[in-house]
Amino acid sequence: MDWIIRGRKELSCSYMEAGAAFLGEDILAFIQGGDKPHIGCTVQSVPRPSLTGNGTISVTSSILNLTGHKDEALCRRLAEKLCRATGRVVVCTGGFHIDNMKPEQIDEVVKALDGLADEIVSGIAGAGYSPLSTGF
């Protein structure tokens, strides 16, 4: 398995990395960073028709958290964005940890992740992978 795209953002407090690879038609993504990269959460996101009936893709996600870990917000954010953009099943795992983070540092981490997510979506398209026809 080759990582289709892998990116890194330097932060004022540390760094964040994210990447994605294909497993058949599905996507495996990861997040890591901070002082103690780890696996704190795994999210599986599955595309489905939006309940609005307007033909857009929505997502249903299942979450596995390690006790005491708060990595769901980041892993879920990346998994659901990739799932919506590609119409593919996405599993994202990883963790980001810095002791005693300040609110502005949390905001910086979220913005970095959003930038990495955009890079991954572009990288998937640039590698020639088009969104799946979901058949909804």
What kind of feature is each model-predicted range?
Residues 1-2, 11, 134:
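Ser/Thr/Pro-rich, acidic low-complexity intrinsically disordered regulatory segments
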Residues 7-85, 89-98, 103-131:
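Conserved mixed alpha/beta catalytic, RNA-binding, or beta-rich assembly cores of soluble enzyme
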